[in-house]
Amino acid sequence: MGAIPSVLFFLLLLRVPESPRWLVKNGREDEAGAVLIRVDTAEAAAKEIRDIKDTLTLGEGSIRELFRPALRRPLLIAIVLAVFQQVTGINAILYYAPRIFEDAGFARMSAIGQSTIVGLVNMLFTVVAIVLADRVGRRPLLLIATGGMGVSLVLLGAAFRFPVLPASALLLIILLYIAFFASAMGPLVWVVMAEIFPIKVRGSAMGLATLILWLADFAVTLTFPVISDKFHPSTAFWLYAAMCACDLVFIWFFLPETKGKSLEEIERSWLKTA
């Protein structure tokens, strides 16, 4: 069963074209134009190829270049987004879902079944994010979803602190939280982190941001059971809700919208604000 998704991914990958940037870099401009024309006009495709050529002349960047004035802001945005993706509690809930459901009153086998439902909702709403990201925009989706996550976590903490709701209601609150996360913070953080960096330094920048993201994940995974045992599960959930509030403020004031902008346009915007 575990091999089925891998096989499907492999088969679908066979139909994915090479990126226009890679094709141009390797002297295959006609193929790059054909790929771009599938999603835009011939005129726009030609302009995009010219922009790609301009960026390719810059060469490869190093980690040291990430700390230049023009790149400090996108680097800070990527790092903060990476941290917020984790400290808003997603992997505490995913990793410890069976324990959370047992604490909520589900039998052990039933708790494992609820964890399966959580995974299914996570997958379905990731598809929603894919559909809406280029229609609605990154910022609106992230703002709405982060607010929804915060409200869900407040309700979840209250449900644990004041156990008057049936276990099924608690399950619905968790599924609501998962749906909000999967529709924005889950996939779109990776999208935004990739989009805001110039091509020259993207590899180094994404590597650094990813390292910090998983360090934050490690911290959350390590501290959730400690907080739950020493204080109360509601304390952890309310702490994650507070992180959602901080994330909302950060997105509102500092995150630019990247919808509809080419990578080259985004790069030029950083140069203007440096």
Short names for language-model regions:
Residues 45-54:
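Short, well-structured alpha-helical segments
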